[in-house]
From Swiss-Prot:
Disulfide bonds: none annotated. This is BTB/POZ domain-containing protein At5g60050. Residues 18-57 are annotated as: Disordered. It comes from the Eukaryota. It comes from Arabidopsis thaliana (Mouse-ear cress). May act as a substrate-specific adapter of an E3 ubiquitin-protein ligase complex (CUL3-RBX1-BTB) which mediates the ubiquitination and subsequent proteasomal degradation of target proteins. Keywords: Ubl conjugation pathway.
Amino acid sequence: MASREVSTMIKQGFIADPSLSFSPSRISSPIKLSTASPPLPPPPPPPPNESTLSNPTLFDMMSDEHNRELPRRKSHARVAQILTEFKNGVVYGHSLGPGDVKLTVVGKDGYRVTMDVHRKVLSEKSRFFMEKMNSRREKGVSHMVEISECDDLEIYVETVVLMYSDDLKKKLIGENVIKILALLKVSAAISFDEGVMSCLEHLEAVPWSEDEEETVVTCLEELHLPDDSVTLILQRVSSQPSTSSTRTRTDDIFSKLLTGVLQAKDDKARREMKVLIFKLVREEADYDVSRDTLYGLCHRCLTSLVLCLSEVTTQMNDPGKDRGALMGEIAREADNMLWMVDILIEKKLCSEFVKLWADQKELANLHSKIPTMYRHEISKITAQICVGIGKGRILVNRETRFAVLNTWLEALYDDFGWMRRLSSRSLDRKLVEDGLSQTILTLSLRQQQVILMKWFDRFLSKGDDCPNVQRAFEVWWRRAFIRQVLTEPDEPRLQITLY
């Protein structure tokens, strides 16, 4: 092999055995990949303590060893769990037979993990593996591949396991931003395009803390991804666009149970069964309930809610009509809808409902015609959606997030005082305010400005009867003014290099 080619492969992190020879008698062809990253700058020295440094006690040495060993044990335990699920077929449902590649991943601490994987999966999902393994392909020959000096062995193993997933976006729901960035880096390094796109879509949809915000921007700049894939993400923090058969039967039973609860005549029994059914749904969160079943019930609840409000608008001025009964009818229908939203969030199927709720112009119009004391329960649905988005449990695109606030935010402001006073036990005010704040901060800077300037005027007029999203206001202010002022003199432009 030419020395230039060897040098190129070393730079790419793929080092082949010089004695590599594909023949019927040779069963294994070891390939070694090195993923060592440049050494980090040394940490700042601790405060000087001559006696401690020169004569550490036995207790000091044991404490240091314990502090180093505990994180390693936790990481090794998580890796073992991932591998157990992988081997037991929990992570993937493919019938590929025994693996034809032995993949060994070695951490910087020397910990080694070996997995039996499939050339077909590696080659189809990773262009890096495809190029390197196809160039050495010979019938009847298995491979041994080693990835050494891994900064985070757990992430490398999990990324390989994710190649077997049929729904990456769903798999990533609930993961924190730092974990997603780690998966993104490894996916980009091995040209796992589906993994890269799923991580980017996740980052665009979930909120970031201020610390995470800087980490996200830095990471995307370092990875040199194509412009189109990161532009939408970076618009959140920059006003300038970046350049850069049994199942069916079970489903029927589930549908009947939900319908029974929604139509229950006894309120006490209804409340008890709501708690029980939701508890069972939460315990079996991975059970793939038919989306059509859940959304069929959601549409039924929405229709009932619209009809209920239509009737109330014609009857609320009727002196012979019991106003308490009117309020009870609306509260019941709204509570049914809210319960269904909770189930959709738990089943990770709520994205479509957010679009549906944003499109309820007729319902929002009827809502505005009814006194607040009757209608305020409906705004709990909007509040719950914001909490779900704010916690990263509902992933929808930016247009949908803005649309749902555009349709329902004024109603939530109007109803918040009644929600706070009459639902003090069931309404977690801080949770709602945090969820609303985080939802607002996932929008573009211009959208954040439009919403928060209106909120500012409303809050000064209503005080405690308006959700307090001061935290969102502070973050927006720093993004829009302080951050822009600090970067304006140099007129920075994110540079993306295509490889």
